[in-house]
Structures are given as structure tokens and as C-alpha cells.
Amino acid sequence: MAQDCREKIISNNYIDFVLDFPLEEIFGDEGGRYDYCYQQVDSRIGILSINRNQLPDTSLLSNDYMSFPDILGLQQVGEETNEVRGEVFNPSPLIQSGITQVQDARLNLTGRGVILAFADTGINYRNRIFRNADGSTRILAIWDQTVQEGEPPEGFLYGTEYTKEEIDRALQTESGIIGNGSTTTAGIQNVRALDIVPSIDENGHGTRLVSLAGGSRLGEGSVYNSPAFQADIVVVKLKPAKEYLREYYQIPDGVSAYSSTDVMMAVKYLDSFAKVFRRPVVFCLGMGTNFRDHESGGAFSRYLNSIASKRSRIMVITGGNEGNASHHYRGRFPEGNGRGENGDRNVASEESMEVYVSEGVDGFLMEVWTEAPVNLAVSIRTPGGEYIDPTSVLFQTNLRYRFVFEETVITVYNAYITQGSGDALVLMRFENPTPGIWTIGVSDENRVADARFDAWLPISEFLQQPVYFLRPNPDTTMTTPAYVPDAITTATYNSFDNSIYQESGRGFSRDERIKPDIAAPGVDLTIAGNRLGEEPVISTYTGASLAAAMMAGAAAQFAQWAVVDGNAPYIRSQEVKNYFIRGASRDRNIDYPNEIWGWGRLDLYNTFVEMER
């Protein structure tokens, strides 16, 4: 059954759904008639992979969109190349964040006894930056979801798990060290580390995050240093999203994209190390999406919050790179919303969104969210002037529009009441959009006074060429799942001049909860964690995911003080967040909390200073 299930989980012929109710509610007593696999995430949430030929209609929009997996992209700037740059490590961001100050003999916070956990593109485990002084690995395990030839972790159905013992054996083989400690070149010419542990990080993003948060200290910190350089490491290399999901979300070729189903299973696996090793675990998520409600109402966000709320778990999530992308629109219908002088309600007020589409865009999605009892209707005007009258889509159905003079096809789907939040969603899927300015009119058929709606376009990584609102709103531009309530959500700033990173995602959440929580450095960071070879090569990188890694490293230092050293053994993400808020650096001329900085800049040293007051 496990092998059979493995094929279903990885095959593009099986469509995945995220369920937050028992499987029996779908199949009843007829489950045996269906070709499917089911993975239990927790007591409420499960993942169904079902043969697409057994669905009544394989057009995805005919099914419940809210059960589709989210698709997430990496929150970095640029891709790593094979070029070796060999720059000099700059400790300034660590000092600015109060990280190196607590590594001294008085507190000696180095991440000792803490597990740093990552779900990302993998790790270059052969790099010296992830080894102890004796050459052994600091990695407790790697679950590579992309390798199907080995055994998956216990209780999981796909991928291959590599233990610390296997990784050490691979490293010893590559260095020519035999089991008895002698060294030779004979007998190892045809055996490499990758023959034993064939897990690599082709992208480099995951390797950089781990190195930044917990890479080994070199040269007593002068050659390289990280916040939690003595923490243990667990990594999940996520498998790429299935092709049907990429096609549905219209992800460009060559762009990394991952399904929330695999991220949830990764987090479940990483969480198990807290139980097995009885140690605190710090999770770092450096990816996100613009889809979903920007409130944490979906099953994915709810699951992450359930993990973040456990004792000895600390969840850190990036706020994303969408703050300056012009991908968010906020509209508000005027007070009265179409009422005439006599109070009649014949015509609803319409708010027009203008979306610019560049040449070379094959397609994109746009989501429009509002609160009940607003009943959204949309009109469409093409760049060529063709017009579709305001139409209210029926509950969980879709309308498909074609045009006379333009080749664009638009499908409009309505979830009148969505799962989780209960809010209303209109999803618009553009195929082969005509370049130019599209005008989308939005009105409320129920004419709720002073009603508001929000619309989002995909993250920049998921667009071939620019697509953006001409009158955007920069707020509420953090990527999902940054809105998870108990997680520590990071804004990104430049620690060299204390300015906010221009692309840093902004809050608050759509329901006005305070997010982001704390800003961390993420601009021009020198990181030793190249994806190739054994020797660390220091290079400079920028991006919101790096701010999350810096915060995760600091959280691991704090977890050592709290849990390992016994000062607050039952601590959770929310309490760690509050400690960090108390110690955050704040400017006198700025009001806090705010949508850009949250509660201020990370200052781990000042967190402990505040405890003494």
C-alpha cells in the first residue's frame, strides 16, 4: 500500500485536495470504488490524492477551489549562479541585531541543544559550513521528497530519509576516511558521497537559509559566524509542485514552485524531532504566495498555527518581497453604496480596478476578497474596449468568457462563503491576456454600506512579465502564510543604514491584526553556503527569506536560554515573539506597531537587558 501510495502522491495523474473533515464524508461507504491515497496531517486535516479520471469534471475550477493546495514561491532576489565570488564576511548585521553580543561567555547562546528546521530547496550537506570541528555533520536528518528509491521516514509515504549516520558515512567516504580511521585512496574511486546520500540543493536557496541561521563558526567568528552555530539541523527538500497545479496557477517554466501539501507534510516531519529528541525546534519558512485570504483562514495557515502554539516550538515565517510590487488593490464602496436620495437601492456603486498587463504574459490569476454579506459582481473591459456587464457568479460555480476581437479567455469563480474564514472570494483566471490596461469593475449587489474589498495578483516570481495595478495599495502585501497568528513574521530591513527594504511585505492582515511582528536584516548579507562543493564560499545576497533565517537563528539562541538552560522550559512562539517585541529597537519619530516595521527591529541583546529592568 505504501509503494502504491507513493506513486499517487508524486504522479501528475492524481489531483490533490486538502480536507479539514473526515474522508468518509466524501466517499461514505463507497471508498473502495475510488483510486486514491490519503495522508493524515493532524487530527483534522488530511490530503487526498485521487485519480483525475474519477473526478466528475477534470476542469479544476469545477471543484472547490478552497480545497486546492496553495502554491508557494521562494522569497529571494535573483538566483545563485555557478560563479565563485569569494567575498569577505561582514558581521555587522549580526552585531546590529544583538546576536553576537549574547554569544559571549556570559550568556554563551549559540543554539546548543536546539534543532533548526527547514522546509525548502534542500541543503548542500557536504559543505564544511554544516560540519563539526571533527568533520562530522551537524545535520540530524534530511528528508528528500524528490528521491523515491530509498525508504521514506517512518509514518510517511514518499521521498527518502537520510540519517545523520548515513550522512557521516557519505562524508567519510568522500574524504577517504575508512571506518577504522585510516586514510587511503584505494577502494573509494568509484564511491562518492552522492552515491550514499544522493540529495543535492540544485537551487541553493535552502543552503543559504541554513547557513545564515546556523552555519558553523569559522576562525572564531572572524571568517564566518551565524546566530546558532552550534544548533543541530534538520532539512526537508520539498518536491516541486505537480505539473497540473503549475498549469492551473499558470506558473512560468523554470520557476521554482511548491505545494502546501508537501510543506504541511514537511512541517509534520520536522515537528516529530521535538518529540523524539525532546528538544526545542525552530521552524524557518522562507517562501510564500499572494493567494488566499491574507488572514490565516485556510487549512494550511491553521495547521502552521497549531504547530506554532505547541510548547518548545518556535515558528518563523518570512513576510515576503511584495511590498513594492503593486500587486494589491483595496477598494471601498461609498457610504450608501448606490442608494438614491429617497433611499432607493436600484443601482450599486462600482469601483474600477485598472490592471496593466505587459507583452509576453501567457496568463495569471487574480483573487478578490471581501466579507459577508457583501455579494460581489464583476464587469470586465478589455484593452480593446470590449465590455462584459456586471455579473454575479452563483455559489461555487464558474463562468467562462470569450471575446470577439481578442483571444483572451477569462474564467470567473465564486466561493460565496469560503472554508475557514467564511469570507467571500471571486477568483479570475486570465488565459492569453491581451497586453494593455484591463478595467475590472467591482460592485456589491447587496449594497452593504461602506463595504470594502481587496484584490491580489500573483507574486512577482509567478509572472513572466510585469502585471500590476495602476492604483495599488502597499499595505497587506505580506505573502501567505505570513499571517499565521502565533508565528513570528519578519519584515526585512537594511541594517547598514536602518532603512526598510523597499520590497519588504507590509501589514496589517486583512482583518487588521498586527503583522509583521519584527524586522530583521535581509539586505546585502554575506553568507557562506554555496550549493556546490565542500568549501564554503562567501557571497552577498538580499531577500525577505534571509530576514526569516536571521530571525530563526536568533530564536534558536533564545530557545537555548529558555528551554535548554531551563529558564522558561514551556515557552511557545507567542511568548518568544513577546520577548523579542520588548527588546526591539525603535525610532522615536515612528509610531509602533505599524504596517512596515511591526514592533521594531530585532535586538536580541536588548531583549535580555529588558529582563533585568
What is each stretch, according to the model?
Residues 103-259, 361-362, 373-374, 484-486, ...:
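Subtilisin-like serine protease catalytic core
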Residues 210-213, 221-222, 234-242, 271-281, ...:
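Hydrolase catalytic cores
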Residues 361-364, 430-446:
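Noncatalytic modules at the cell exterior or secretory-pathway interfaces
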Residues 282-283, 300-340, 601-609:
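Catalytic cores of secreted or luminal carbohydrate-active enzymes
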Residues 423, 447-460:
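Edge beta-strands of jelly-roll/beta-sandwich modules across compartments, strongly enriched
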Residues 143-152, 156, 161, 165-176, ...:
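Extracellular S/T/G-rich loop segment that most often corresponds to the catalytic His/Ser-adjacent loop
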Residues 71-72, 238, 267-295, 318-319, ...:
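Short acidic, glycine-rich surface-loop motifs adjacent to enzyme active sites
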